[in-house]
Amino acid sequence: MKFCTSCGNSVILQIPAGDDRERFVCTSCEHIHYINPRIIVGCVPAYEGRVLLCKRAIEPRRNYWTLPAGFMENGETTPEGAARETWEEARGRVSNLELYRVFDVPSISQVYMFYRCDLDDGSFGVGPE
């Protein structure tokens, strides 16, 4: 980060008063910019005892198998995001979502939330990713 999103002036990395971590702080308006982890949501969609996997069509990890997942959007719940990602990536409609696993990857500042769910009617297709 180079510039303040509040006023446009430059920012510096420093520990603000009352804090114990480095943050980007504006040199003009003193706004503190918090950089937080990103939330990744996804599904483990099952139909008749089988789990739907996706083969990646884009980098990173093109041609690797993965579960349908992606970044959570503003204004949605984690189950809504997981269902949306399953539709976007595999054209699968899901229901009965139950939280299955939460894990974090601190090295890339991401938190993953996966839901077990039913793949409605077993149908799926190819998404753009």
Residue locations for each model-derived region?
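Acidic, metal-coordinating catalytic segment for phosphate/diphosphate chemistry
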Residues: 1-43
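Nucleotide phosphate-binding site architecture
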Residues: 5, 27, 52, 73, ...
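Beta-strand-connecting loop/turn residues
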Residues: 22, 48-50, 109, 122
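Conserved beta-strand segments that form the floor/walls of ligand-binding pockets within enzyme
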Residues: 25, 52-53, 66, 98, ...
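Short glycine/serine/proline-enriched coil/turn segments at secondary-structure junctions
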Residues: 35, 61, 106-108
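Conserved Nudix-box catalytic region and its N-terminal flanking loop in Nudix hydrolases
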Residues: 46-88
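Unchanged
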Residues: 72-129
